UniProtKB/Swiss-Prot annotation:
<dbReference type="InterPro" id="IPR006063">
    <property type="entry name" value="HisA_bact_arch"/>
</dbReference>
<dbReference type="GO" id="GO:0005737">
    <property type="term" value="C:cytoplasm"/>
</dbReference>
<protein>
    <recommendedName>
        <fullName>1-(5-phosphoribosyl)-5-[(5-phosphoribosylamino)methylideneamino] imidazole-4-carboxamide isomerase</fullName>
        <ecNumber>5.3.1.16</ecNumber>
    </recommendedName>
</protein>
<keyword id="KW-0368">Histidine biosynthesis</keyword>
<keyword id="KW-0963">Cytoplasm</keyword>
<dbReference type="GO" id="GO:0000105">
    <property type="term" value="P:L-histidine biosynthetic process"/>
</dbReference>
<dbReference type="Pfam" id="PF00977">
    <property type="entry name" value="His_biosynth"/>
</dbReference>
<dbReference type="InterPro" id="IPR044524">
    <property type="entry name" value="Isoase_HisA-like"/>
</dbReference>
<dbReference type="InterPro" id="IPR023016">
    <property type="entry name" value="Isoase_HisA-like_bact"/>
</dbReference>
<comment type="pathway">
    <text>Amino-acid biosynthesis; L-histidine biosynthesis; L-histidine from 5-phospho-alpha-D-ribose 1-diphosphate: step 4/9.</text>
</comment>
<feature type="active site" description="Proton donor">
    <location>
        <position position="131"/>
    </location>
</feature>
<feature type="active site" description="Proton acceptor">
    <location>
        <position position="8"/>
    </location>
</feature>
<dbReference type="InterPro" id="IPR011060">
    <property type="entry name" value="RibuloseP-bd_barrel"/>
</dbReference>
<dbReference type="GO" id="GO:0000162">
    <property type="term" value="P:L-tryptophan biosynthetic process"/>
</dbReference>
<keyword id="KW-0413">Isomerase</keyword>
<dbReference type="GO" id="GO:0003949">
    <property type="term" value="F:1-(5-phosphoribosyl)-5-[(5-phosphoribosylamino)methylideneamino]imidazole-4-carboxamide isomerase activity"/>
</dbReference>
<comment type="similarity">
    <text>Belongs to the HisA/HisF family.</text>
</comment>
């Protein structure tokens, strides 16, 4: 089970939100590149970046910080990024910078054909991010909850060549209330695409539960507030996950 530290970028700083609310941001670092190096040194084998400003604006907003992170760690570990990716040009620019994968979220829900086009243009490099509240997909930086169930949406992408789906339970994100294992497993069982869990990871019991769900198609987990606030020691958690594989 791969654990992936999250670095959420807001105005060039590393922050964490509660339930996706920009006004509920806690600043953890003024140097995202140093944060990226820290997680690499703790044993991270991949990093997850989110351009929070970009998610709301619909265009990249934190390029200097993203470039600094890539300069610091991209030669050693793959880095993926989501937030504000709405067209093929942006994807190409990000991949040219050194990102390994890009995450299409809002645009995947609004225009599933865009995912197909992106997978064709950049095979193996496209991740779909599905964010849900009570099972229904949310878009535009979680500001709008749609009438689409995430499982129905996920099935649309099965034949497109998506490399994985990141499933975020908005109600759990940043709340330290535990991963929504049931919803994550239901999604993973419903599709042939590997699912990465996100939102609510709190302690080692969550790691154990996620590892037990690997057989259902849960391939990894993104962790944020828990590793920043210390309820999870990242190195210890990854070692535990490796031992349970």
């Amino acid at each position: 089970m791969l654990l992936i530290p999250a670095i959420d970028l807001k105005e060039g700083r590393c922050v964490r939100l509660r339930q996706g609310l920009m006004e509920e941001a806690t600043v953890f670092s003024d140097s995202p590149a140093e944060t990226a190096l820290h997680w690499f040194e703790q044993g991270a084998r991949r990093l997850h970046l989110v351009d929070l400003n970009g998610a709301f604006a619909g265009v990249p907003q934190n390029l200097p910080a993203i470039k600094d992170i890539l300069a610091a760690v991209a030669k050693d570990i793959p880095v993926q990024l989501g937030g504000g990716i709405r067209d093929l040009k942006t994807i190409g620019q990000y991949l040219d910078l050194g990102l390994n994968d890009v995450i299409i979220g809002t645009a995947a829900v609004k225009n599933p054909d865009f995912v197909r086009e992106a997978c064709k243009a950049f095979p193996g490099r496209i991740i779909v991010g599905l964010d849900a509240k009570d099972g229904m997909a949310a878009i535009d930086g979680w500001a709008t909850v749609t009438g689409h169930h995430v499982i129905d949406l996920a099935k649309r992408f099965e034949d497109d060549g998506v490399n994985s789906i990141i499933y975020t339970d908005i109600g759990r994100d940043g709340m330290m209330s535990g991963v929504n294992i049931d919803a994550t497993v239901k999604l993973a069982q419903a599709v042939r695409i590997p699912v990465i869990a996100s939102g609510g990871l709190t302690g080692l019991d969550d790691i154990r539960a996620l590892c037990a769900a690997e057989k259902h198609g849960v391939a990894g987990a993104i962790t944020g507030r828990a590793i920043y606030e210390g309820s999870i020691d990242f190195a210890q958690a990854q070692q535990l996950a490796d031992s349970l594989d």
